[in-house]
């Protein structure tokens, strides 16, 4: 290229046609920048030196959302090693209920209620069936996320294996009930109400915590050996009872309001 020359490169995976000229590509670039600037303007950011970092974090969280369903994925990548040239290379392109709850809290705090509301209904959709709540789902609510090794790929800087899918999808992790109850409680407080069809879903999660809190599980570390007793899992079972109790009081469900605090106290004493 000589000074003053212009070129463009377009990588596209979209229903929309890619740009066919530099002018077209540049106009789309400008439009995209304006779109995200306008999106950030909807937020409520504190005025201090770290604001730009908060804005960048908000953009990252938004970039990890799947707009057709509201799912929030843990990462956009698979098989990047936890340590250089290591073997702990997992596929994180899925929506973990626990991790998404943290994202939900962050979005609410920064004023992005729309995105948080979308994830709320995604959680409701995956939890409303008769099956037990899983720890994670695909972006469209897929439940079966079987893990597969791609032997023909060498991996990032030679780190292998390269995996797609995640074998932890069917693990028992007892923090999941507290995570979903906490996210629904946060949503209910921000909305001053809860859709009527949601309450039976939440009661089922509380009852699951009551039934299983004494049992061993795989924990937030997703251990692939024998189940163990993790304090963090017991704490989140207590959270399920505590948030369930608070929601029950908001709904003036006096019977549950009398029962659940007693069980929460039992879990608290055990911890």
What are these regions (language model features)?
Residues 1-271:
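Acidic, mature catalytic/reactive cores of soluble proteins
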């Amino acid at each position: 290229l000589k000074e003053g020359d212009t070129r463009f490169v377009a990588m596209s995976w979209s229903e929309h046609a890619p740009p066919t000229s530099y002018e077209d590509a540049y106009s789309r670039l400008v439009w995209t920048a304006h779109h995200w600037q306008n999106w950030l303007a909807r937020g409520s950011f504190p005025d201090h030196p770290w604001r730009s970092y908060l804005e960048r974090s908000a953009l990252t969280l938004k970039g990890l959302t799947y707009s057709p369903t509201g799912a929030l994925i843990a990462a956009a990548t698979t098989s990047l090693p936890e340590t250089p040239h290591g073997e702990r290379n997992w596929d994180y392109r899925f929506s973990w209920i626990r991790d998404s709850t943290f994202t939900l809290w962050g979005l609410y705090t920064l004023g992005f209620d729309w995105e948080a509301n979308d994830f709320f209904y995604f959680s409701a959709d995956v939890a409303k069936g008769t099956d037990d709540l899983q720890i994670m789902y695909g972006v469209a609510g897929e439940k079966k996320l079987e893990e597969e090794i791609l032997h023909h790929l060498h991996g990032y800087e030679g780190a292998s294996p390269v995996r797609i899918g995640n074998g932890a999808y069917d693990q028992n992790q007892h923090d999941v009930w507290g995570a979903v109850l906490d996210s629904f409680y946060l949503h209910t407080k921000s909305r001053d109400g809860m859709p009527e069809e949601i309450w039976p879903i939440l009661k089922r999660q509380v009852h699951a915590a009551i039934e299983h809190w004494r049992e061993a599980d795989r924990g937030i570390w997703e251990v692939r050996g024998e189940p163990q007793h993790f304090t963090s899992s017991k704490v989140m079972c207590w959270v399920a009872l505590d948030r369930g109790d608070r929601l029950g009081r908001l709904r003036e469900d006096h019977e549950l309001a009398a029962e659940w605090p007693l069980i929460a106290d039992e879990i608290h004493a055990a911890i």
